[in-house]
């Protein structure tokens, strides 16, 4: 429901707010699957999806914190540019009315901002990719665990989880659509308002934390996945480690597990998820 509402939002922060509700639903779906698996004696799978849900909370926090900060930077600069144009313009009653009616959070007043705010645009792209679950970026690793293990529970007798399993699969494509739409409306294409020419990148006090959060968003999820974050968060491991493998061996293991699981049913689920989130959703935007 939250993902569907995000489809039609023009307020950049409302898109992110409804996205947060949608991602929380992912987390709770994972916790529900974990509970069923624990109750049926499948403790290993239950622990993994429980750890995956907690891992997704971390990945989502990194990405969404950065996205809200980046969107705030965009809103501030758009508002500042509009004020600049207002003070340069005439002082008529109509001008005052249009000034007060202007919404700096409305993406319909943006467009083409990537050339004006390259750091912010890059940060929001990486954050959006993490929320979408683009392969190898942040949230992909935890979302893959939640979707895979929820379908695993259904395939092993949890008929009540068919609805949630279908919904989180469909939501993967919906997330790809509304997050791509947000980025394209804000940063791509031709400017839809003359104020865009007066927009510039934020100060280093904003850019620096954006860069730090972008690195954590892009690489943090991957790095933690390689070092066994899911097993650690599920209490299956006492600490983060490479489990006796070299770094390259562990990277290959995680990539194979994500893209080529032994269970063919889960392999198809994973490929459909990637198709919906990475290709169909963004193309439709």
What are the roles of these predicted feature ranges?
Residues 207-225, 259-285:
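Glycine- and aromatic-enriched alpha-helical transmembrane segments of multi-pass membrane proteins
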Residues 1-202, 216-223:
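Hydrophobic transmembrane alpha-helices and their helix-loop junctions in integral membrane proteins
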Residues 24, 127, 206-220, 241-257:
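Hydrophobic membrane-spanning alpha-helices of multi-pass integral membrane proteins
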Residues 145-156, 227-264:
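Membrane-interfacial helical/loop segments at transmembrane boundaries in membrane proteins
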């Amino acid at each position: 429901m939250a993902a569907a509402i995000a489809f039609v939002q023009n307020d950049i922060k409302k898109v992110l707010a409804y996205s947060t509700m949608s991602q929380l639903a992912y987390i709770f779906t994972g916790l529900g699957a974990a509970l069923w698996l624990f109750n049926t004696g499948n403790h290993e799978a239950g622990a993994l999806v429980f750890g995956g849900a907690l891992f997704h909370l971390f990945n989502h926090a990194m990405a969404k914190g950065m996205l809200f900060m980046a969107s705030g930077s965009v809103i501030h600069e758009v508002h500042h540019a509009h004020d600049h144009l207002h003070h340069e313009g005439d002082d008529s009653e109509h001008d005052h009315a249009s000034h007060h009616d202007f919404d700096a959070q409305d993406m319909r007043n943006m467009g083409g901002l990537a050339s004006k705010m390259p750091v912010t645009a890059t940060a929001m792209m990486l954050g959006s990719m993490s929320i979408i679950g683009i392969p190898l970026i942040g949230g992909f690793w935890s979302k893959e665990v939640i979707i895979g293990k929820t379908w695993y529970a259904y395939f092993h007798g949890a008929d009540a989880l068919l609805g949630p399993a279908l919904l989180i699969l469909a939501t993967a494509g919906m997330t790809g659509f509304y997050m791509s739409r947000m980025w394209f409306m804000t940063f791509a294409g031709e400017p839809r308002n003359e104020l865009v020419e007066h927009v510039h990148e934020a100060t280093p006090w904003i850019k620096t934390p954006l860069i730090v959060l972008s690195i954590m968003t892009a690489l943090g999820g991957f790095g933690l996945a390689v070092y066994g974050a899911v097993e650690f968060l599920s209490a299956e491991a006492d600490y983060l480690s490479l489990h006796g493998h070299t770094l390259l061996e562990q990277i290959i293991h995680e990539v194979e597990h994500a893209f080529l699981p032994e269970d063919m049913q889960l392999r198809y689920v994973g490929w459909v998820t990637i198709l919906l989130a990475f290709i169909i959703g963004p193309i439709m935007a």
